[in-house]
Regions:
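Acidic-basic catalytic patches of nuclease active cores, encompassing PD-(D/E)XK
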Residues: 1-63
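Active-site metal-binding core of divalent-cation-utilizing nuclease and nuclease-like domains
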Residues: 35, 42-77, 87-96, 103
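Short catalytic-loop micro-motif centered on adjacent basic/acidic residues
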Residues: 80-84
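Short acidic, S/G/P-rich loop/turn micro-motifs used as interaction or catalytic elements
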Residues: 86-90, 117-120
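Arginine/glycine-rich "motif VI" loop of SF2 helicases in the C-terminal RecA-like domain
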Residues: 101-107, 137-142
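Conserved beta-strand signature within the Rossmann-like core of class I S-adenosyl-L-methionine
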Residues: 106-116
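Domain-level recognition of nuclease-like catalytic cores that cleave nucleotide substrates
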Residues: 117-167
Length: 167
């Protein structure tokens, strides 16, 4: 499974109305391809979102709060992309960051990218099941229309230098 998108409270309708369905799917597929097995995910994510025109702004569109450096990973036509691939537990902070932008009128919906990798010892079920329960439990604090994209990026692949190709 490369990635899975879960839509909550009609976020898919907002994305459809903004004619961003294909754009979002191709962006998430590109992020998945670029980050799978990588070590430096933060920089690669910024580069991928920049190449897909999610970071192209001159008017502070990425900013969450005026006068602060808090920024989304990307924004396009009122849809923000936020995420963290280190820990699934970023779901709470990520949803909060999106909700602040929504409440301030900066965005209409958001996509939260998370890792689907969690401890095999977890008794809480799959990341998909947990995301559904947590978004429901966070209502009414998190009340916006939001989508969650779960990625299985695998562990970093570190080359030992014996592969064919290169110089």
């Amino acid at each position: 499974m490369p990635f899975e998108i879960l839509h909550f409270r009609g976020s898919d309708e907002i994305i459809k109305d903004k004619n961003l369905e294909r754009d979002i799917k191709s962006t998430l597929a590109y992020v998945d391809d670029a980050l799978y097995g990588s070590i430096y995910r933060g920089e690669l994510l910024r580069q991928a979102l920049d190449e897909m025109d999610w970071r192209d702004n001159g008017d502070g569109e990425l900013k969450i709060l005026d006068g602060r450096r808090y920024m989304y990973k990307g924004v396009k036509r009122g849809v923000a992309i936020e995420g963290n691939f280190s820990v699934y537990e970023y779901i709470l902070e990520g949803l909060f960051r999106l909700q602040v932008g929504f409440d301030k009128g900066r965005i209409e919906t958001g996509i939260l990218m998370l890792t689907s990798m969690r401890s095999e010892k977890s008794s809480l079920g799959t990341s998909r099941d947990l995301a559904i329960v947590e978004v429901e439990q966070l209502y009414p604090t998190i009340s916006m229309q939001v989508s969650i994209a779960l990625f299985a990026l695998g562990p970093p692949i570190i080359s030992n230098g014996t592969e064919d190709g290169g110089d």
